[in-house]
Swiss-Prot record:
It is found in: Cytoplasm. This is Ribosomal RNA large subunit methyltransferase H. It comes from the Bacteria. Keywords: Cytoplasm, Methyltransferase, rRNA processing, S-adenosyl-L-methionine, Transferase. The keyword Transmembrane helix does not apply. Belongs to the RNA methyltransferase RlmH family. Its EC number is 2.1.1.177. NCBIfam families: PRK00103.1-4, tRNA_RlmH_YbeA. Specifically methylates the pseudouridine at position 1915 (m3Psi1915) in 23S rRNA. InterPro entries: Alpha/beta_knot_MTases, RlmH-like, tRNA_m1G_MTases_N. Homodimer. GO terms for molecular function: rRNA (pseudouridine-N3-)-methyltransferase activity.
Length: 156
């Protein structure tokens, strides 16, 4: 199973990119992780935020791998502990399809993106910079894969 993390937003600062690359490298033993950056919609004075979100949504949907199992990261989604994420990863692997994880823009995902998702995952009620979410997701995917492989990384 390959995983494509589709994230709406600008290019990440170097410290985020370095952290993401580190977990991407570690995770490659168990699951290739690809980052696809989606250009954010135009926002600002006199601009319609919903139109920007819908534009982003169209670009996200176009970036989905064919027949992928789609999981949208969304605040009202299902919260998962690290152990529960490992169980979900095992389930996703059992689907026999690639995985697409979606990180939305400032207003979240468009209705079309949420409709396309097989499930939604909440990493918690905190408001986090979307760049940081990329790094958190990469680390948690690595942690879940390490747990499934009985690797000593996870010590809870």
């Amino acid at each position: 199973m390959k995983c494509r993390l589709i994230a709406t937003g600008e290019r990440a600062p170097s410290w985020v990119a370095q952290g993401f690359a580190e977990y991407q490298k570690r995770l490659s033993h168990w699951m290739p992780l690809e980052l696809v950056e989606i250009e954010p919609g135009l926002r600002g004075k006199g601009r319609d935020a919903q139109r920007a979100t819908d534009d982003e949504g169209r670009r996200v949907l176009a970036a989905l791998p064919k027949n992928a199992y789609v999981v949208a990261l969304d605040v009202p989604g299902r919260p998962l502990s690290s152990e529960q994420l490992a169980q979900r990863m095992e389930h996703w692997r059992g689907q026999g399809r690639d995985l697409a994880l979606l990180i939305g823009g400032p207003e979240g995902h468009s209705a079309e993106v949420l409709k396309s998702a097989s499930e939604s995952w909440s990493i918690g009620p905190l408001t986090l910079p979307h760049m940081l979410v990329r790094l958190i997701v990469a680390e948690q995917l690595y942690r879940a894969a390490a747990m499934l492989a009985n690797h000593p990384y996870h010590r809870a």
